[in-house]
Amino acid sequence: TVLARPSKANKKKLAPYANQIRVVWGDLTKYEDVLEGVRGADYVLHVGGMVSPAADYFPNKTRYVNVKAAENVAKAVLAQPNADDIKVCYIGSVAQTSDRNEPIHWGRTGDPICISVYDHYAISKTLAEKAIVESGIKQWVCLRQSGILYPAILKNYDPIMFHVPLRGVLEWATVEDSGRLLANLCEENVAPDFWNRFYNIGSGPEYRLSNYEFECKLLKTISCPAPEKIFNPEWFVLRNFHGQWYADSQVLEDYLHFRA
């Protein structure tokens, strides 16, 4: 079962799978829609919500949508007759641990939650994570997603690119790895001690880059020189963003074996 908004884009994307899955056309902020989506589920993967850069333009809407959605998911799961048997996965964000420029650029899930100034998206993800963890759901897991690498990333021309400090770092996750880990999470052979814990999602050592290195690689794909050759370095912020290299991303890989 997939819960999706009845937009033209979603209907086009899901049309090829119409005979293979059950689609609930609805809204995560409407409890009855979420309840219908959860009905009969053994696993609930709460992946949807508002993300940047849209989240930066609509901060109040972002907080409402992301928090309300998590509350509805928790309420719907607990309303099921087999609630204690349902396994729930919530997708958090690297943004929850804020600015991590060197020398504090290595991080773990146990690090303090620390949100960048004006980052309403990170606030919403933290409150939503709390709503799931403290709801009373018996079997939950929180996976904090990093930046996702996907082919259309080159089409995202937005001022947010200057909100990223060049000396910052990030351990990226590919879209393929991200999808595979959700599929593997639903397998019956997942160890019992996997649940009721927090994990960081990352595609591993080869995907640990400084933001400057990433900008260079990105620009090279469109035959452009290094950032300092075409941008004024002063256009980029120096801090108050997020991103880190994970000291513990291998833990999730050891459980779910999702990396290519």
Task: Identify the role of each PLM range.
Residues L181, L185-Y255:
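Mid/C-terminal beta-alpha module of Rossmann-like enzyme folds, strongest
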Residues I123, V164-N189:
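Substrate-positioning beta->alpha
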Residues A9, T29, K61-N72, I115, ...:
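Glycine-rich NAD(P)-binding loop of the Rossmann-fold in SDR/ketoreductase-type enzymes
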Residues A18-K68:
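NAD(P)H-binding glycine-rich loop region in Rossmannoid oxidoreductase-like domains
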Residues M50, E71-Y118:
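Conserved Rossmann-fold NAD(P)-dependent oxidoreductase catalytic core, especially the SDR/UDP-sugar
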Residues Y64, Q96-V141, P165:
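Catalytic helix-loop patch of NAD(P)-dependent Rossmann-fold dehydrogenases
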Residues T1-A9:
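Conserved glycine-rich Rossmann-like NAD(P)H-binding loop of the short-chain dehydrogenase/reductase
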Residues G48, C89-S93, R144-S146, G202:
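Active-site beta-alpha turn of Rossmann-fold NAD(P)-dependent dehydrogenases/reductases
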